[in-house]
Amino acid sequence: MSFTSDVKKELTRNLATTGALLALVRMNGSVGIFNGLTLSITTENAGTAKYIYQMLQELYEIHAEIRVHQKTTLSKNRVYTVFITEGAGELLDELSLADSLMLDNGVPEFVKNDEFIKKDYLRGAFLSAGALHNPEKGEYQLSIANVYQEHAEDLQEIFRDFGLNARVIERKNRWILYLSKAEEIMDFLTLIGAMKARLKFEEAKIMREMRGLANRQSNFENANIAKSVMAAQEAIDAIQFLNEKKELEQLPPSLKEIARLRLENPEATIKELGELLDPPLGKSGVNHRLRKLVERSNDLKKVES
């Protein structure tokens, strides 16, 4: 089951509300005439279809029919249609959509002016056409697809009412409203009543950040190891060159001693080399002596070239 499906499953366990039903009718509903006025609400999510059916019964005592058919596209998804014959006109009146469903493409004005209905409407909008990327994979993104630009921009206004900086883009004849910041996505999930999903998202975000930190730490350590290995090999090459040229015996005792220890312990760290000296020497002191050997070797090579 996808992360989006998990969120929608949780949302359908919320209480039936007019605001959620209103969004589903506005975004997924279509009016027809078959022995009178009919209303169809379509979704590809079985749980959402059942939720619509239950809300119609609980809120308006309307007994609908759920019809299932297969999509003809390559996706082969099932499509669920909640079909209302008796009471369709009365329902549209109750939802204040009787005069606007086919004419007005935005969010109804009375929704924008009611704090509680706005939250419920957002829940319905996500159930209707929402998607949430798995936070463990790829980028953070929550989106709601809209057929009409006006509706997308009205939703954007509602998002901003709740401090959420949503953006709207056009993609494949749809207007997509989306959030891309993890904190705002978590706030939205809390707002629409998906607390389990919010906690799961936050946990995945933390784990992803910890893995990223561990990878950066590992890369940093590997880079340091590589630098240390290169520096050690450079010193060994310099000492061997000086030895071939009979120059080691001309060096001060402190440099001769560190040269001997470096050759005898090629895999030792700078710290370990320092501890082998008597008296022990710190890392900066060991590095200083090894650099002197490399400089002496380079100077000799310049003279010979």
UniProtKB/Swiss-Prot annotation:
It comes from the Bacteria. Involved in cell division and chromosome segregation. It comes from Lactococcus lactis subsp. cremoris (strain MG1363). PROSITE patterns: INTEIN_ENDONUCLEASE. Residues 269-302 bind DNA. GO terms for molecular function: DNA binding; endonuclease activity. This is Probable cell division protein WhiA. Belongs to the WhiA family. InterPro entries: Homing_endonucl, Intein_endonuc_central, Sporu_reg_WhiA_N_dom, Sporulation_regulator_WhiA, Sporulation_regulator_WhiA_C, WhiA_LAGLIDADG_dom. PANTHER family: CELL DIVISION PROTEIN WHIA-RELATED (PTHR37307:SF1). GO terms for biological process: cell division; regulation of sporulation. Keywords: Cell cycle, Cell division, DNA-binding. NCBIfam families: DNA_bind_WhiA (TIGR00647).
